[in-house]
A protein has these predicted regions:
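Intracellular loop-helix junctions on the cytosolic face of multi-pass helical membrane proteins
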Residues: 1-31, 147-253, 406-427
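Helix-loop boundary and gating motifs at the non-cytosolic
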Residues: 12-78, 235-276
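Substrate-agnostic recognition of the 12-TM MFS/MFS-like secondary transporter fold
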Residues: 33-49, 70-76, 80-84, 125-179, ...
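Transmembrane alpha-helix termini and helix-breaking/packing motifs in multi-pass membrane transporters
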Residues: 54, 86, 169-193, 263, ...
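Membrane-helix boundary and inter-helical linker elements of multi-pass secondary transporters
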Residues: 58-59, 89-90, 115, 146-149, ...
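C-terminal ends and interior cores of transmembrane alpha-helices
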Residues: 102-117, 307-326
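Alpha-helical transmembrane segments
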Residues: 121-129, 196-207, 322-338
């Protein structure tokens, strides 16, 4: 008689983690490669988005320089989308994607090499970073569209948001502590700018590893079709309005945390600590949303992100203190990925629909979508500059987020209408 064997517990943390890993393995190979690449690059983005802004603030104390840098970045992105559309006909898409990741390290190196921070040098570094983002996002969007379908895009963007949120905990906390300790303990003879250069080296190493991973993908190359058009389906123009509204928040959302924390809350250590608070819970929630929700839940998820952003802006305007910054950062840590989780799958679903209707290269929609985002970003940055010049820096930092958050709420009925039209067309 065989001895009875104890049944393995099927509710432990390790078992559940292995189960989720096996579930990940059921998805298409190219989708998994793309997610692994994005996971690695997720640890670069917080460095670029957060600490470049604080580096400019520390070495110039000019809020306008931070916004000028961001405008240069946003100007470089759509130009690169245009160039990328032509290069895709001659160069492998994985190579262009890798080039974009590597350029982010080059931009930071240019910034750190400047002996004195002047507007011209800052704009040059911003344009290079714009090239980096352009090659990265243009090819990433195309690969995401080609490697996923509407049935698995919630999972794709949920897992991607999980990576991004975990990185927003680990990277700001570690690098913020490193930069703070450099200043407090006199490491490198107290030269904090040398510490920033070591952070730039860290970025280079990660981008090289991420580039190696994406080269393993077996991605189909795009068709050499025309991608420049002026007329589009009415459904796409509605999507473009949504893109402009999304861009308005992007125009200020990247630099806002750096300016708020350096102005009201402290230094880089504080910046890293604030980003870490509550982000672990956010990461788990985002993964679960991506794992178990469907396309029918996207508008609700998107709306929740928009409401959180507006709520954070309201608290910042009302309190305008370190406490207000903490509340805003907590709202941002959860609200921003919720907006992305609801927005990007909807965008790709619309592209699938209108590209079939109009028999066009899907990159045509990815390209023009970026220009809609640029219009919004320009408005967002421009609003801050106008408020700064017309009133004061304090007024701009205090109220711009609230104004943008309220404007963003217009996106909710637009997204609901787009989803309704898509559902009707697919019946």
């Amino acid at each position: 008689m065989k001895e009875a064997t104890a049944a393995r517990p099927k509710h432990g943390v390790l078992y559940r983690a292995l189960s989720e890993f096996r579930h990940f393995g059921t998805y298409p190979f190219n989708m998994r490669i793309l997610l692994l690449t994005n996971m690695l690059y997720a640890f670069v983005l917080p460095v670029v988005e957060l600490f470049v802004g604080t580096y400019i603030m520390r070495n110039s104390s000019e809020l306008a320089y931070v916004v000028g840098y961001q405008l240069a970045v946003y100007t470089g992105i759509p130009i690169t989308f245009l160039v990328n559309g032509f290069l895709m006909r001659r160069i492998r898409i994985a190579h262009l994607y890798s080039f974009g990741m590597l350029l982010s390290g080059v931009s930071m190196a240019v910034m750190m090499s400047l002996e004195t921070l002047e507007l011209g040098g800052i704009i040059l570094a911003g344009l290079i970073m714009g090239l980096s983002y352009g090659f990265f996002w243009a090819n990433r969007d195309f690969l995401a569209l080609a490697s996923t379908d509407d049935g698995n895009r919630n999972y794709y963007y949920g897992l991607e948001s999980f990576f991004n949120t975990v990185a927003s905990v680990v990277v700001p906390g570690m690098i913020g502590a490193f930069l703070g300790a450099t200043a407090d303990h006199g490491w490198f003879a107290g030269n904090i700018n040398f510490a920033y250069k070591l952070v730039t080296l860290f970025v280079f190493v990660l981008t090289i590893v991420a580039s190696t991973v994406v080269m393993r993908g077996r991605f189909a190359e795009p068709k050499h079709d025309r991608f420049l058009f002026r007329r589009f389906d009415t459904l796409w123009w509605r999507m473009m309005r949504l893109a402009v509204l999304k861009g308005i928040a992007q125009g200020y959302i990247v630099t806002a945390p750096s300016m708020l924390v350096m102005t009201l809350a402290g230094n880089e250590t504080t910046l890293g600590t604030l980003q870490s608070i509550g982000a672990i819970v956010s990461a788990v929630l985002l993964y679960l949303l991506g794992r178990f929700t469907t396309s029918h839940h996207r508008v609700a998820i998107f709306s929740a992100g928009l409401l959180l952003f507006a709520l954070g802006g309201a608290f910042n305007a009302a309190l305008y203190s370190a406490a207000g910054v903490i509340v805003f950062m907590l709202c941002l840590v959860l609200g921003r990925p919720l907006m992305d989780l609801g927005y990007f799958p909807l965008q790709l679903r619309v592209i699938d629909c209108v590209s079939r209707r109009e028999h066009r290269n899907s990159y045509a929609y990815i390209f023009i979508h970026e220009f809609a985002l640029y219009l919004g970003r320009f408005f967002g940055c421009g609003l801050f500059i106008v408020l700064t010049l017309a009133v004061s820096d304090t007024f701009a930092i205090r109220y711009a987020l609230l104004i943008i958050g309220v404007i963003q709420l217009i996106s909710i009925p637009i997204a609901r209408g787009i989803t309704h039209t898509l559902d009707q067309s697919e019946r």
